[in-house]
Each structure stands twice: as C-alpha cells, then as structure tokens.
Amino acid sequence: MATFSTNEFRGGLKIMLDGDPYTIVENEFVKPGKGQAFNRTKVRNLKTGRVLERTFKSGESVEAADVLEMNMQYLYKDEDNWYFMNPETFEQLPAAQAAVADAEKWLLEQDECTVVLWNNNIISVTPPNFVERKIVDTDPGLRGDTSGGGGKPATLETGAVVRVPLFLNIGDTIKVDTRSGEYLGRAKE
C-alpha cells in the first residue's frame, strides 16, 4: 500500500486513519524552539463528514486512502438508496442516504455530480457547484419591487429554500450556488 510522509501533506490529500478514509482540510508545519517538529492537521472523515484535529511527528508516514473521485449521473431514488450511473461504463451503483446527505436538496434526475468511491461503495456525493432550478413556491412579487433591498424565500423544485429578490415569481428558473445556497441570477433561456 502507498504511504505519504508528513512533508507531503497538503490540502485535499486522501489518507487512512483508524481504518477510515480521511481528506486533509488544513495542514500546518510547526517547528518549536525546543523539541521535534510536527504537523498540525485538520482532517475530514469521508464517511461521516466529521472534522478532527490530529498531529503527526515530522517524518511519520501515513497510509494513502484508496478512494476514487469520479463524475457520475444521478438516476433515481427508492425507499432506501439513491442510484448513480458511470456515464462511460453505464454501471449503476447505489448510495445510502448518509452518503448523499446535503446534496439531496440540489439533485434532479439526470444531473452530473462528483462521487467518492471507497471499496466500490459510494461514501460521498457532491452536487455541481452551480445548478439551474425552477421556483415552485414563493410569495407573489408586488409592483415596485426592485432587485435592491430585501428578498424573500423561494422553494425550488428539489425542495431547497433559497433567498431571492422580490421581483421573481413562481415558474421562474434561477441559477444557484450549491456550496453556499445563494441566488446568483436568472437562468439564461
């Protein structure tokens, strides 16, 4: 199995700790005036999403996580699982609700998303950074409403609630940043 030395640590590197795959979020090299140098890292568990702080002695080596990140197409959902397809091989893989997590409120059937595979199981799903969705419920816009000031909540076709300008109505298609949940503008039709 491949290993990484602490001097190879950088953000985004996938490593194994305590039998689970983790990704390094932050890495800081610390060289105290007295004593051995070490790396202070923040790591995110790819299965649960929890973030931990760990320290590693300088020169220590850690096993590399055998994870694969790939683009897959979301197909459908049943009672227990979400199903994704590899667009090159047409292989379909199920994902548990825990793996989909917050991506659920942005996904529509046929959407391309980034999926992390570990032991041929989907452990994490990331929606596209920007999506275009139709507004299915919002308060009606009134005369004199402008894009400046305020805003109102709007429910999208996937169930996500986004704060939008007052002039938007039911049926309008908008562009949203899925990382922050922010309204970016009307969709170009």
From Swiss-Prot:
Modified residues (N6-(3,6-diaminohexanoyl)-5-hydroxylysine): 34
Organism of derivation: Dichelobacter nodosus (strain VCS1703A)
UniProt entry tagged with the keyword Protein biosynthesis: yes
Protein name: Elongation factor P
PTM notes: May be beta-lysylated on the epsilon-amino group of Lys-34 by the combined action of EpmA and EpmB, and then hydroxylated on the C5 position of the same residue by EpmC (if this protein is present). Lysylation is critical for the stimulatory effect of EF-P on peptide-bond formation. The lysylation moiety may extend toward the peptidyltransferase center and stabilize the terminal 3-CCA end of the tRNA. Hydroxylation of the C5 position on Lys-34 may allow additional potential stabilizing hydrogen-bond interactions with the P-tRNA.
Taxonomic lineage of the native organism: Bacteria, Pseudomonadati, Pseudomonadota, Gammaproteobacteria, Cardiobacteriales
Keyword Cytoplasm: yes
GO molecular function: translation elongation factor activity
Gene Ontology BP annotations: peptide biosynthetic process
Family: Belongs to the elongation factor P family.
Pathway entry: Protein biosynthesis; polypeptide chain elongation
Signal peptide, first to last residue: none
Function: Involved in peptide bond synthesis. Alleviates ribosome stalling that occurs when 3 or more consecutive Pro residues or the sequence PPG is present in a protein, possibly by augmenting the peptidyl transferase activity of the ribosome. Modification of Lys-34 is required for alleviation.
Keywords: Cytoplasm, Elongation factor, Hydroxylation, Protein biosynthesis
Compartment(s) where it occurs, according to its Swiss-Prot or TrEMBL record: Cytoplasm
Cellular component terms (Gene Ontology): cytoplasm
Chain's gene name: efp
InterPro entries: Elong-fact-P_C, NA-bd_OB-fold, Rib_uL2_dom2, Transl_elong_fac_P/YeiP, Transl_elong_KOW-like, Transl_elong_P/YeiP_cen, Transl_elong_P/YeiP_CS, Transl_elongation_fac_P
One protein family per Pfam: Elong-fact-P_C
HAMAP family cross-referenced by the UniProt entry: EF_P
